[in-house]
From Swiss-Prot:
Lineage: Eukaryota, Metazoa, Chordata, Craniata, Vertebrata
Protein family: Belongs to the protein kinase superfamily. CMGC Ser/Thr protein kinase family. CDC2/CDKX subfamily.
Cellular localisation: Nucleus
Organism annotation: Xenopus laevis (African clawed frog)
Protein name per UniProt: Cyclin-dependent kinase 7
GO (cellular component) term, any one: cytoplasm
Subunit field text: Probably associates with cyclin-H (ccnh) and mat1 to form a multimeric active enzyme.
Keywords linked to the UniProt accession: ATP-binding, Cell cycle, Cell division, Kinase, Meiosis, Nucleotide-binding, Nucleus, Phosphoprotein, Serine/threonine-protein kinase, Transferase
Post-translational modifications: Phosphorylation of Ser-170 during mitosis inactivates the enzyme. Phosphorylation of Thr-176 is required for activity. Phosphorylated at Ser-170 and Thr-176 by CDK2.
EC top class named in words: transferase
Gene3D superfamilies in the cross-refs: Phosphorylase Kinase, domain 1 (3.30.200.20), Transferase(Phosphotransferase) domain 1 (1.10.510.10)
Length: 352
């Protein structure tokens, strides 16, 4: 981590240390490249943070990037992405990470792959182990979703993209509720809670587990109101007795009393131990929601089948561009194939 702490290093010479090999993807806040470290011959991923908003960077500092660097410098766990280097000037910052072969979103969407109960258990075990480590250090991830769960060539899953991560624990600290991608956002966040804890990450884990089982997003809402409607229609509308304090949340709206569908009728192939875990993750009262440590002690993880070792987990059978083409065809979208297709059209969306 010597490179991260260095000051006054010439940015151009630092950047020349890395040979760009491929464009991996572009998000709202960053562009990601595959590169080779010329000094070590190691394959890495470089996340170039885009210039922040004027208000955020008016003193020449991208605070989101600095927060991500600061947090990642303090973390060391097999299931957390490794920050290898960081360099930049003012609000232009590049972060260098372990290169990861794929992500859980790609695995879920690759219909040529069969995900067995042992595979799913392995993904959940690694996710929860990384999350337990974070929560023990009083850090919330706040943006868990399948494409932020990366997999290396050995099948090791690592939590990534800590741009929204935050330390927690102060009883009087107020947080923003505009975190977590909507489909994985917990009910308390959707109701505008400004004080929350590990429950926001655990609800997201439940949504990811459901997506692994169903192979489609579990609760794909179009707006915050639609998201809450889908949650309550599916899982039932909670009462004040089930979730004390619900009606006092800043953006609370009373909903029709939906009965919901029992989990065993939604996840028809799930055993009692898996249903017990899902029930714990989808508990409406965030104070009673299952924690990462509690989840790892559930009988689901000690019962058979045992989790599949990482090196035996499935890997994408087709190229990313072929996978995207298949998804478009499934949606009835015809795409014209052309020679020399723009790299941006076939680039994999990958966040670090």
């Amino acid at each position: 981590m010597e490179g991260i702490a260095a000051r006054g290093v010439d940015v151009r010479s630092r950047a020349k240390q890395y040979e760009k090999l491929d464009f991996l993807g572009e998000g709202q806040f960053a562009t990601v490249y595959k590169a080779r470290d010329k000094n070590t011959d190691r394959i890495v991923a470089i996340k170039k943070i885009k210039l922040g908003h004027r208000a955020e960077a008016n003193d020449g500092i991208n605070r989101t990037a600095l927060r991500e660097i600061k947090l990642l410098q303090e973390l060391s766990h097999p299931n957390i992405i490794g920050l290898l280097d960081a360099f930049g000037h003012k609000s232009n910052i590049s972060l260098v990470f372990d290169f990861m072969e794929t992500d859980l979103e790609v695995i879920i969407k690759d219909t040529s792959l069969v995900l067995t109960p042992a595979h799913i258990k392995s993904y959940m075990l690694m996710t929860l182990q990384g999350l337990e480590y974070l929560h023990h250090l009083w850090i919330l991830h706040r943006d868990l979703k399948p494409n932020n769960l990366l997999l290396d060539e050995n099948g090791v899953l690592k939590l990534a993209d800590f741009g929204l991560a935050k330390s927690f624990g102060s009883p009087n600290r107020i947080y923003t509720h505009q975190v977590v991608t909507r489909w994985y956002r917990s009910p308390e966040l959707l109701f505008g809670a400004r004080m929350y804890g590990v429950g926001v990450d655990m609800w997201a884990v439940g949504c990811i587990l459901a997506e692994l089982l169903l192979r489609v997003p579990f609760l794909p809402g179009d707006s915050d109101l639609d998201q809450l409607t889908r949650i309550f229609e599916t899982l039932g509308t909670p009462t004040e007795e089930q979730w004390p304090g619900m009606s006092s949340l800043p953006d609370y709206v009373a909903f029709k009393s939906f009965p919901g569908t029992p989990l065993h009728l939604i996840f028809i192939a799930a055993g009692d131990d898996l249903l017990e875990l899902l029930q714990g993750l989808f508990t409406f009262n965030p104070c009673a929601r299952c924690t990462a440590s509690q989840a790892l002690r559930k009988r689901y993880f000690s019962n058979r089948p045992a989790p599949t070792p990482g090196n035996l987990l499935p890997r994408p059978n087709c190229s990313i561009e072929a996978l995207k083409e298949q998804q478009n065809l499934n949606l009835g979208i015809k795409r014209k194939r052309t020679e020399g297709m723009d790299q941006k059209d076939i680039a994999k969306k990958l966040s670090f």
